[in-house]
Amino acid sequence: MRPSNRTPAQSRPVTITRQFTAHAEGSVLVEFGDTKVLCTASFEEGVPRFLKGQGQGWVTAEYGMLPRSTHSRMNREAARGKQSGRTQEIQRLIGRSLRAAVDMKLLGENTIVIDCDVIQADGGTRTAAITGACVALVDALNWARGKGILKTNPLKFLIAAVSVGIYKGEPICDLEYIEDSAAETDMNVVMTETGKMIEIQGTAEGEPFTHEELLSLLDLAKHGIREIVDIQKASLS
C-alpha cells in the first residue's frame, strides 16, 4: 500500500494555473499534489552567439528551489556562489525536452527562456517543471504570434513528464517524496502527447531491475503522461 493510498498507476492530482504572473509572456503554476512549481517563459529577440546568422531559434531553461521549498531551509545557490550538479542536470533536462517540441527554424532568431522555480517540493519537481513549462511555452509562442513576431506556430506537439519507480517491490507512478527517498528504482520519463519518448532517466537505487520491470515502468509512465497531457489540453482550451 502506498503512503497516500493511491493505486500503483494513480498519479497525484495535477493542477495547471495559467497567467499566474503579470509580466512573463507565459506563466504557469503547476501542482503535482504537494509539489508546486512556478514556470515562466520569456520571449526574447536574438539567439546565442553560436546560432547567429543561422536563421533558427533557441529554447533554454533555468531551474531553482526556494530556500524553504523543502522541510528544512537550504541556502540559495546564489549565496553559495555556484549551482549544484543536480540543478545543472535538471535545467539541461528541461531545456532538452522543450527543444524537442519546437521547430527552431519556425521560431526564427528568437530565444525563449524558461524559468522553473520550485515553491514547494514533495518529489517529482523536475517532471512537474517540464509539464508546466510546456504550457508556459505555448502561451509565450501564442503571445509572439499575436504580436506578429511569428507567422507560424513553431510548436510541434505538447510534452509532459512523470516519475515512476519501484517502491517496496512494486512499480508505481508519480512518486511523492516519502516514496522517492525509499524507492529501489527511480525513473523520470518525458514523452510527447502521442506517446513517443523524449528522455528516460532511470537508476537502480537499491536492487537492479529487470527488463520486465523496465517495461512495466514505461507502461505506467505512458498511462500517467497521457492523463497529464489531457490536463494540459484542458488548461489551454
From Swiss-Prot:
Phosphorolytic 3'-5' exoribonuclease that plays an important role in tRNA 3'-end maturation. Removes nucleotide residues following the 3'-CCA terminus of tRNAs; can also add nucleotides to the ends of RNA molecules by using nucleoside diphosphates as substrates, but this may not be physiologically important. Probably plays a role in initiation of 16S rRNA degradation (leading to ribosome degradation) during starvation. This is Ribonuclease PH. Belongs to the RNase PH family. The keyword Nucleotidyltransferase applies. Homohexameric ring arranged as a trimer of dimers. Keywords: Nucleotidyltransferase, RNA-binding, rRNA processing, Transferase, tRNA processing, tRNA-binding. It is an enzyme of class 2 (transferase). The keyword Aminoacyl-tRNA synthetase does not apply. The gene is rph. It catalyses: tRNA(n+1) + phosphate = tRNA(n) + a ribonucleoside 5'-diphosphate.
